[in-house]
């Protein structure tokens, strides 16, 4: 099935392609990787993405977002994939924004969604241990290792 973008979606894709080729080529990814950046991404690049409105693409307009949809966001990720762009856009702009929009209380939406849009927060997904029904039997232990690491049951997971 061919996906045909409308004019706005194509424009967003073109802007993303131009921006990422200029500001986040594959060499940028290698630099982040080789310097062992604790965040795992470039804070200035993330701020620039926020300034372009990418963090608010899936956020409803009533919370300061653009409510542009998954196809629009997908066109950005297609270009990010070509450049191997490390950023918190998926964790924040897709997972965080979607989960809060779909399952958050009105208070949570009013508090967190505008902060996702303006880039003042980033989010991460935490998964509970569904096979454990007693609080005394939970194996996951969260400790502070760095901004991007979580040690869970003797295994390091990168968020």
What are these regions (language model features)?
Residues 85-107:
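N-terminal glycine-rich flavin-associated loop
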Residues 149-152, 156-159:
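Single conserved hydrophobic/aromatic residue that forms the stacking wall/gate
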Residues 40-42, 101, 133-137:
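Short, solvent-exposed polar/charged micro-motifs at secondary-structure junctions
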């Amino acid at each position: 099935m061919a996906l045909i973008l409308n004019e706005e979606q194509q424009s967003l894709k073109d802007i993303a392609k131009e921006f990422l080729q200029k500001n986040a080529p594959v060499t940028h990814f290698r630099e982040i990787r080789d310097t062992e950046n604790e965040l795992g991404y470039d804070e200035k690049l993330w701020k620039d993405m926020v300034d372009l409105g990418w963090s608010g693409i899936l956020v409803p307009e009533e919370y300061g977002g653009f409510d542009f949809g998954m196809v629009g966001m997908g066109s950005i990720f297609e270009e990010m994939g070509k450049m191997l762009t490390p950023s918190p856009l998926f964790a924040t702009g897709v997972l965080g924004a979607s989960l809060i929009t779909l399952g958050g209380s009105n208070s949570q939406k009013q508090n967190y969604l505008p902060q996702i849009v303006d880039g003042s927060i980033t989010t991460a997904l935490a998964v509970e241990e569904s096979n454990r029904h007693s609080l005394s039997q939970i194996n996951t232990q969260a400790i502070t290792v760095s901004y991007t690491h979580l040690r869970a049951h003797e295994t390091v997971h990168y968020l």
